[in-house]
Amino acid sequence: EYVEHIDLNFGCPVPKVTRHGGGGALPYKQNLFRKIIKSAVGAAKDEIPITVKFRMGIDDNHLTYLTAGKIAEEEGASAISLHARTVKQLYSGQADWVAIRKLKEHIKTIPVFGNGDIWEAHDAVEMMRVSNADGVVIGRGCLGRPWLFKQLGEIFAGKEASQFPTLGAVSYTHLRAHETPRY
């Protein structure tokens, strides 16, 4: 009753995780990937949506995203998200928004969200235009930019995105975040 959804995030590219077959490397192990999703969906019993995030693959020679997306769809995931980079890329280079489009064309019954290189509201609009994704997943782009979510809401509501906050407003926001009690 306290959980709105569970995201199975197979997007971690950090070598200390992937060299042991975890994180972004796990979808390469298709049977294990399938078992994890099937188990999570089964345990949720249609009460909690299970979403799955993954990368394009280990590297350009080991792309797994189309198969991973199909497995997630077949096993009952409610939605999938693609970080449009390989594990090898880590966070370098440009996200391949065309890969998100290919995944969107490959998946027929669940929403496909795109992730990667969303730093400003107009980036999200452009990613959705290029990829035809059903939505965006914001990662590093919101770190230090909490106003990004407000701007995204404005843009997707058909309004102009508000201006970037002043230095004073940013300082105040960060100060408040550090003063807020953690429970």
Regions inferred by a protein language model and the residue ranges of each:
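Short glycine-enriched, charge-decorated loop/helix-capping segments at active-site entrances
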Residues: 21-27
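Catalytic cores of alpha/beta
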Residues: 63-68, 118-134
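Acidic, proline/serine/threonine- and glycine-rich low-complexity intrinsically disordered segments
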Residues: 169-171
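Conserved small/polar residues in nucleotide/adenosyl-binding loops
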Residues: 173-180
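Glycine-rich beta-to-alpha transition loops that act as phosphate-gripper elements at the mouths
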Residues: 54-59, 111-122, 140-142
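Glycine-rich phosphate-binding active-site loops on the catalytic face of alpha/beta enzymes
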Residues: 133-149
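C-terminal helical cap(s) of enzyme catalytic domains, especially alpha/beta-barrels
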Residues: 145-160
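Alpha/beta enzyme core
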Residues: 3-6, 10, 15, 20, ...
